[in-house]
Amino acid sequence: MKRVDTIRPRSRAVRLHVRGLGLPDETAIQLWIVDGRISTEPVAGADTVFDGGWILPGLVDAHCHVGLGKHGNVELDEAIAQAETERDVGALLLRDCGSPTDTRGLDDHEDLPRIIRAGRHLARPKRYIAGFAVELEDESQLPAAVAEQARRGDGWVKLVGDWIDRQIGDLAPLWSDDVLKAAIDTAHAQGARVTAHVFSEDALPGLINAGIDCIEHGTGLTDDTIALMLEHGTALVPTLINLENFPGIADAAGRYPTYAAHMRDLYARGYGRVAAAREAGVPVYAGTDAGSTIEHGRIADEVAALQRIGMTAHEALGAACWDARRWLGRPGLDDRASADLLCYAQDPRQGPGVLQHPDLVILRGRTFGP
């Protein structure tokens, strides 16, 4: 899907009014916007900027990387451009699952999406993509590193749960179970949640039993680890559009045939395993893994991919909108909430061709449109 043209600020009006069919409840609603916040009570002198169609909270990309490029950190101007791309397609809340660039300065830009940061990836030497992670020489350093990233982030910490171990020639866990338990307990004591990159099978039991809050990707889920996720209340962000990179990763791994075969097997089973988790009741949310190899602005494609695991169009949109906001502790179209919402002339559940092109974006009470 091509990136949409950048949409421009349309208005800085202090008082706005929108009217239409609100999602998720599919009821007629009217909202007034005053000083960047929603009011459910009428406000005199408001300018009606949308009348008819569908109104919903801003979309959520629950797994992206603002400030990350193919080789690691990027200049702040590039990070801003990445965030603008997300805003243009309606993704107004981003969970940044690890970035080497300090993007805290973006919080001062009222025209950019809100970012929930997870600090930097935590990994072992040569056990993740070069330039992306803080690499710990000894796994015993993990609890202290988690505490540091919890302070750096916005309530999340990101671990690399598995990666290729070149000594054995296949995917393998990075951390022992007791270290994981201590690290995740440390994060929880600081009020932070923890998530982990996991492609394969072996790293999952230790992470889930240690109390991790979320699994990213999860292509190696088994019936047993799905049951563990249900027992522990672990969420899943499968980044399904990233699954399409697995064959290319395998093709490039000629020196490691076992690893290549494993990646192809995970690709073949990935949708089925995520579907099984969803059917069992594991909470599933939409994230694109944008940054590095995945272009920003593809949340509509991920919503479409979620329908391939059995979600209805309404459920898939919820996984990238109202349900994801609830999971992340952020409001929707609530009275006094920040006015971060989207307006569509057509039903956005029709598909990515509609969802990716909101007719009106309202962010912090400012309007943006084609």
UniProtKB/Swiss-Prot annotation:
Classification via CDD domains: Met_dep_hydrolase_A
Stored SUPFAM superfamilies: Metallo-dependent hydrolases (SSF51556)
Signal peptide: none
Molecular function, one GO term: hydrolase activity, acting on carbon-nitrogen (but not peptide) bonds
Pfam families: Amidohydro_1
Superkingdom of source: Bacteria
Database matches in PANTHER family: ALPHA-D-RIBOSE 1-METHYLPHOSPHONATE 5-TRIPHOSPHATE DIPHOSPHATASE (PTHR43135), AMIDOHYDROLASE-RELATED DOMAIN-CONTAINING PROTEIN (PTHR43135:SF4)
Similarity-based family: Belongs to the metallo-dependent hydrolases superfamily.
Name this protein carries in UniProt: Uncharacterized protein Mb2939c
